[in-house]
């Protein structure tokens, strides 16, 4: 049984120039995930459920657990000294870590500390998403927003933790996707899925059909396609939508499928955040043989213009994303 720590160190040896800093950074994320896992499991027994009464920069009311997870991850990353600063869905602006170690650190981290946190109250799976970049400003001085506004193809690592019937950490450093299941009796993540690949075709589509009337025509046509009877393509497909990006993505990664959060009449730019949600999931998807786009363009090629930028998101098995894109191209302005 190989642990996450052993696996990371083993892979580090494949790179002669590796310094161990990225390994230490991933270890900090692992620690943060353990703390969040522990406290999610007793969330109903302590006062960390419900809303905080505070709104974030997007105008959304933050859950208590959102803020709690944000603080725990931020503290874990700051303590290691391998991170120059972070950007978080729960922070209005970038957070610059102070001190000589931070100013000399190579990396910045972007994160959604607790995706799907509104599901906690009803005991549904939630997750943590993270994305790691090399800073582009000179070493030895504080980072700036420019270090965070990089296109997704510059990520050096990305991953997520899904807190469900078991807790799993899934990550990539650009050399495939690997998944580790947490053993709470030992306090370690153990390798359970190596070199995970999206099935090339799937029979599940994940979308909130309650918003159907607001969807672009291309999305409506694709949903209709998914629901039609056709033995050759094993249709109709099955709808599976949890309402937590991490949980929906994780299921589709293992079983095959597509996740869609399109633009709508009320959210013409989409609702998911490019930097905290779409880029890391797109990196994972491509490393697992899948595809991710905004319905027309590769997610990882989008150059962000602001921290909390939103985009439409199509991600999953490659053939399914390409079919959805074909409908979007056929009905571009409807």
Swiss-Prot record:
KW Hydrolase (keyword) present: yes
Q: Which Gene3D superfamilies match?
A: 3.40.190.80, Fructose-1,6-Bisphosphatase, subunit A, domain 1
Question: What PROSITE patterns does its record include?
Answer: FBPASE
Binding, Mg(2+) 1: 89, 112, 114
Q: What is its main location?
A: cytoplasm
Q: Which domain of life is it from?
A: Bacteria
- Tell me its EC number(s), please: 3.1.3.11
> Which biological process, per GO, is one annotated for this protein?
fructose 6-phosphate metabolic process
Record-listed substrate binding positions: 115-118, 208, 241, 271
Protein name stated in the entry: Fructose-1,6-bisphosphatase class 1
Species, as recorded: Photorhabdus laumondii subsp. laumondii (strain DSM 15139 / CIP 105565 / TT01) (Photorhabdus luminescens subsp. laumondii)
What broad taxonomic lineage does this protein's source fall under?
A: Bacteria, Pseudomonadati, Pseudomonadota, Gammaproteobacteria, Enterobacterales
Gene encoding it? Answer: fbp
């Amino acid at each position: 049984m190989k642990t996450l720590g052993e696996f990371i160190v083993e892979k580090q040896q494949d790179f002669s120039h590796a310094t161990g800093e990225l390994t230490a950074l991933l270890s900090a994320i692992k620690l943060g995930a353990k703390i969040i896992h522990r406290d999610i499991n007793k969330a109903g027994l302590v006062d960390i459920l419900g809303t905080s009464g505070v709104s974030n920069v997007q105008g959304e009311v933050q859950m208590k657990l959102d803020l709690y997870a944000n603080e725990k991850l931020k503290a874990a990353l700051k303590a290691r000294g391998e991170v120059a600063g972070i950007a978080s869905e729960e922070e209005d602006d970038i957070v610059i870590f102070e001190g000589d170690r931070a100013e000399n650190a190579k990396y910045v981290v972007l994160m959604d500390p607790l995706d799907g946190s509104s599901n906690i109250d009803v005991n549904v799976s939630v997750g943590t998403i993270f994305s790691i970049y090399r800073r582009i400003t000179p070493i030895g001085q504080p980072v700036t927003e420019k270090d965070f506004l990089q296109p997704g193809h510059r990520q050096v690592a990305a991953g997520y933790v899904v807190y469900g019937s078991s807790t799993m950490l899934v990550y990539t450093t650009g050399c495939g996707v690997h998944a580790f299941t947490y053993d709470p009796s030992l306090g370690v993540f153990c390798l359970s899925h190596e070199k995970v690949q999206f099935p090339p075709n799937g029979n599940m589509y994940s979308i909130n059909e309650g918003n159907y009337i607001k969807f672009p025509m291309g999305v409506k046509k694709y949903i209709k396609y998914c629901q039609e009877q056709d033995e050759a393509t094993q249709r109709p497909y099955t709808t599976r939508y949890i309402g937590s990006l991490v949980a929906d993505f994780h299921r589709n990664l293992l079983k095959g499928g597509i996740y869609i959060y399109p633009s709508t009449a009320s959210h013409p730019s989409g609702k998911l955040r490019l930097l905290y949600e779409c880029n890391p999931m797109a990196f994972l998807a491509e490393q697992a043989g899948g595809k991710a786009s905004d319905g027309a363009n590769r997610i990882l090629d989008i150059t962000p213009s602001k921290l909390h930028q939103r985009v439409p998101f199509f991600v999953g098995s490659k053939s399914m994303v390409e079919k959805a894109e074909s409908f979007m191209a056929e009905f571009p302005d409807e």
